[in-house]
Amino acid sequence: MGTKCCKPVSCGMCKKTENTLMDYKGNPILLTTEFTVLTDTESEEEGMADLEKPLLERVQATLAAKCDTEVEKKLPLKSKK
């Protein structure tokens, strides 16, 4: 079904399949020159991990301190005898 649907659209516009996209004015969009290929995003992911780690540690420390405070509030006070 996919090839039957796409065939009339791509055959009518251009001979090459990379030029079959049109903008709102009817001009062809050349995918090879308009967009760049993303091949390696590993370095970006590593950079984000380095930024997220200190933030995560701060959030965990804040939550731990808050939990400790809540536990102390709920503990019964020991009376001196």
From Swiss-Prot:
Main subcellular location of this protein, as a coarse class: virion
InterPro entries per UniProt: Herpes_UL11_megaloV/roseoloV, HSV_CEP3_betahv
Presence of the UniProt keyword GTP-binding in the record: no
Lipidation (N-myristoyl glycine): G2
Recorded topology in the membrane: Lipid-anchor
Disulfide bonds: none
Entry similarity comment: Belongs to the herpesviridae cytoplasmic envelopment protein 3 family.
Localization in the cell: Virion tegument; Virion membrane; Host cell membrane; Host Golgi apparatus membrane
The keyword Membrane appears for this protein: yes
CC terms in the record's Gene Ontology section: host cell Golgi membrane; host cell plasma membrane; membrane; viral tegument; virion membrane
One Pfam family per UniProt: U71
Domain of life the protein comes from: Viruses
PTM summary: Myristoylation and palmitoylation (probably on one or more of the nearby cysteines at the N-terminus) enable membrane-binding and Golgi apparatus-specific targeting and are essential for efficient packaging.
UniProt record, GO biological process: viral budding from Golgi membrane
Annotated keywords: Host cell membrane, Host Golgi apparatus, Host membrane, Lipoprotein, Membrane, Myristate, Palmitate, Phosphoprotein, Virion, Virion tegument
Organism this protein belongs to: Human herpesvirus 6B (strain Z29)
Assembly notes: Interacts with cytoplasmic envelopment protein 2; this interaction is essential for the proper localization of each protein to the assembly complex and thus for the production of infectious virus.
Primary role: Plays an important role in the cytoplasmic envelopment of tegument proteins and capsids during the assembly and egress processes. Also participates in viral entry at the fusion step probably by regulating the core fusion machinery.
Identification of the protein by name: Cytoplasmic envelopment protein 3
